[in-house]
């Protein structure tokens, strides 16, 4: 005798929805929160690189460049840009021989 014949299978009545009162405000609120959470999660996954780069580098104000020669300002800008460019490589490819 196989195991499949000994397992009880639920009847059609067992799969029916038991929450007939779907106009309950708690159920509606939970549904709205769930949908909003899903939308925000999808947007986060789509734009996380832009969002976190903006948070990491965009909100920080650099040191004041008052009284600093233009050549040093340009050097500082290049260093900052190279730091941003390096940050693009979150994922590293490792090749095994």
Swiss-Prot record:
The M2 protein from most influenza A strains is inhibited by amantadine and rimantadine, resulting in viral uncoating incapacity. Emergence of amantadine-resistant variants is usually rapid. It comes from the Viruses. Forms a proton-selective ion channel that is necessary for the efficient release of the viral genome during virus entry. After attaching to the cell surface, the virion enters the cell by endocytosis. Acidification of the endosome triggers M2 ion channel activity. The record marks 37 as: Essential for channel activity, possibly by being protonated during channel activation, and by forming the channel gate and the selective filter. The record marks 41 as: Seems to be involved in pH gating. The keyword Lipoprotein applies. Homotetramer; composed of two disulfide-linked dimers held together by non-covalent interactions. May interact with matrix protein 1. Residues 44-97 are intravirion. Cytoplasmic tail plays an important role in virion assembly and morphogenesis. GO terms for molecular function: monoatomic ion channel activity; proton transmembrane transporter activity. GO terms for cellular component: host cell plasma membrane; membrane; virion membrane. A lipid is attached at residue 50 (S-palmitoyl cysteine). Residues 1-22 are virion surface. Residues 60-83 are annotated as: Disordered. It is found in: Virion membrane; Host apical cell membrane. The chain crosses the membrane at residues 23-43. The modification Phosphoserine is found at residues 64, 82. It is a single-pass type III membrane protein. When the channel is activated, one or more imidazole moieties of His-37 probably become bi-protonated. Its main location: virion. Keywords: Disulfide bond, Glycoprotein, Host cell membrane, Host membrane, Host-virus interaction, Hydrogen ion transport, Inhibition of host autophagy by virus, Ion channel, Ion transport, Lipoprotein, Membrane, Palmitate, Phosphoprotein, Signal-anchor, Transmembrane, Transmembrane helix, Transport, Viral ion channel, Virion. GO terms for biological process: protein complex oligomerization; symbiont genome entry into host cell via pore formation in plasma membrane; symbiont-mediated suppression of host autophagy. This is Matrix protein 2. The gene is M. Glycans are attached at residue 20. Belongs to the influenza viruses matrix protein M2 family.
């Amino acid at each position: 005798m196989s195991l499949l014949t000994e397992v009880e299978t639920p009847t059609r009545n067992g799969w029916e929805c038991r929450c007939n009162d779907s106009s309950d405000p708690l159920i509606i609120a939970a549904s709205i929160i769930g949908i909003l959470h899903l939308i925000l999660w999808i947007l986060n996954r789509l734009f996380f690189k832009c969002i976190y780069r903006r948070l990491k580098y965009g909100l920080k104000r650099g040191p004041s460049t008052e009284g600093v020669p233009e050549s040093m300002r340009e050097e500082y800008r290049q260093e900052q840009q190279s730091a941003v460019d390096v940050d693009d490589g979150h994922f590293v490819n490792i090749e095994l021989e």
